[in-house]
């Protein structure tokens, strides 16, 4: 018999019905976090073109929602990788200028998978602001339920919050290297199985970081609704891979996006030692000195 459990931080996930009821609350601020990856073979060192979701946002969006542009406004412009976390002081300034801060409850949604919302959720989390939720099912679920949309653009006035930074959550290659042979650590690849096992060479060198396990991020999402699977189902997915709370768990993917969904679920299940490899395979697979395997 499966023992019912619940998400540890239930306020970090809101449903569409809740948002519809609270959409006119002046303390609620809603943000579309959508970004698109157009996969291409035109430049092997970068397997996709990044396309802002601003155009789609302007066509229609959840009423009273603003747009957050992950790559153009919230990523390190000096990095060779698409979504590198910027300096936290710069990130905090950018987010505050876009209206994130006290006393507001921030709602994040995306329209092509929850991972874009969870990426920005973690970016705000590492700054110490906790009044942030993702919309379960995102824009697709909102539309499926027949909820209203609009084209009017929203721009919130600046807000403020006291930063309590947790820079250790987003890690680099040295952390990953030290985790490979560490019996108290585990690496989780959030990409699809064909990439993990080397059939798909999207990121250059085929395969996965040596010793890492594969828990594709989409396995944590219901394929019909686009909503998160139940806490019981999510916990079983991790337990089936012998992931326990005493381990240091580092999540990676292609560019630090899908991994944030796995990390978000782990956090919601009460795991504490959670890390995200920021540049992931976009960095790792391009360096032949870093170990990878296909079995």
Predicted regions and their residues:
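Cytosolic catalytic domains that perform sulfur/thiol-centered chemistry
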Residues: 1-295
């Amino acid at each position: 018999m499966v023992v019912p459990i619940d998400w540890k931080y239930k306020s970090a996930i809101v449903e569409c019905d809740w948002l519809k009821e609270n959409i006119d609350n002046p303390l609620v601020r809603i943000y579309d976090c959508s970004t698109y990856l157009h996969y291409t073979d035109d430049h092997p060192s970068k397997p996709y073109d990044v396309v802002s979701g601003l155009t789609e946002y302007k066509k229609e969006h959840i009423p009273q929602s603003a747009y957050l542009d992950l790559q153009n406004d919230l990523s390190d412009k000096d990095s060779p990788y698409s979504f590198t976390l910027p300096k936290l002081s710069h990130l905090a300034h950018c987010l505050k200028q876009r209206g994130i801060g006290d006393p507001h409850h921030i709602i994040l949604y995306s329209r092509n998978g929850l991972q874009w919302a969870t990426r920005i959720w973690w970016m705000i989390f590492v700054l110490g602001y906790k009044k942030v939720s993702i919309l379960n099912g995102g824009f697709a679920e909102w539309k499926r339920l027949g909820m209203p949309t609009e084209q009017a653009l929203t721009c919130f006035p600046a807000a403020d919050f006291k930063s309590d930074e947790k820079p250790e959550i987003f890690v680099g290659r040295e952390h990953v290297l030290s985790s490979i042979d560490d019996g108290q650590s585990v690496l989780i690849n959030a990409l699809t199985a064909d990439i993990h096992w080397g059939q798909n060479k999207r990121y250059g060198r085929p395969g996965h970081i040596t010793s890492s396990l594969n828990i594709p991020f989409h396995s944590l999402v219901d394929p019909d609704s686009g909503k998160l699977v139940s806490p019981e189902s999510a916990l079983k997915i991790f337990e089936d891979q012998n992931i326990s709370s005493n381990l240091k768990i580092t999540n990676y993917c292609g560019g630090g996006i899908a991994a944030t969904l796995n990390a978000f679920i782990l956090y919601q299940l009460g795991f504490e030692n959670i890390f995200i490899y920021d540049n992931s395979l976009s960095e790792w697979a391009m360096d032949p000195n870093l170990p990878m395997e296909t079995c």
